[in-house]
């Protein structure tokens, strides 16, 4: 059992090393898009299922409250939080529409959708992306494995942050780190600090 625990740490470290080579450019591009979105008076909507829903909430909480520096709140909404809305849509229509209907109501041109799925094949996240595109929003996707069906929906205006791993737990661990990198870049760009302070 101890070896298995050590192996999990080793695998996580190796996945992060691999990601540190593969992902910085796409994370930087996504952060720049998010900064421009926020400077333009727009907002960021985020969605995912299970652990990815938790990641969406984590991201929006960091923007609405703060990440590491004191600053004004920034507009972000996690679409996985309103249980009454989610269950109404799932009951009356289908689970695949729980995010897309919210995007059709809340999304505006210039907004960004942060779409999170370790496999890239979550039906309701794919529908969310389709709704975002119909609302002239841009998309930042956080995926893993081969990017799944989500990869095929992205245009040159969108950004894919695809973790180089096939293991769900390792992908989720890097997703959290990528989210922290996004938040750090957003904060440091919008609210530059004296690095020596």
UniProtKB/Swiss-Prot annotation:
Q: Name one GO molecular function term.
A: zinc ion binding
Known EC number(s)?
Answer: 5.3.1.28
The record's subcellular locations are:
Cytoplasm
Q: What is its main location?
A: cytoplasm
Pathway named in the protein's UniProt entry: Carbohydrate biosynthesis; D-glycero-D-manno-heptose 7-phosphate biosynthesis; D-glycero-alpha-D-manno-heptose 7-phosphate and D-glycero-beta-D-manno-heptose 7-phosphate from sedoheptulose 7-phosphate: step 1/1
One GO term (biological process): D-glycero-D-manno-heptose 7-phosphate biosynthetic process
Q: How is the cofactor bound?
A: Binds 1 zinc ion per subunit.
* Domain (SIS): residue spans on this chain: 34-196
Q: Which reaction does it catalyse?
A: 2 D-sedoheptulose 7-phosphate = D-glycero-alpha-D-manno-heptose 7-phosphate + D-glycero-beta-D-manno-heptose 7-phosphate
- Kindly give the NCBIfam families that the UniProt entry links to this protein: PRK13936.1
User: How is this protein named in the record?
Assistant: Phosphoheptose isomerase
Q: Which source organism? A: Shewanella pealeana (strain ATCC 700345 / ANG-SQ1)
Encoded by which gene? gmhA
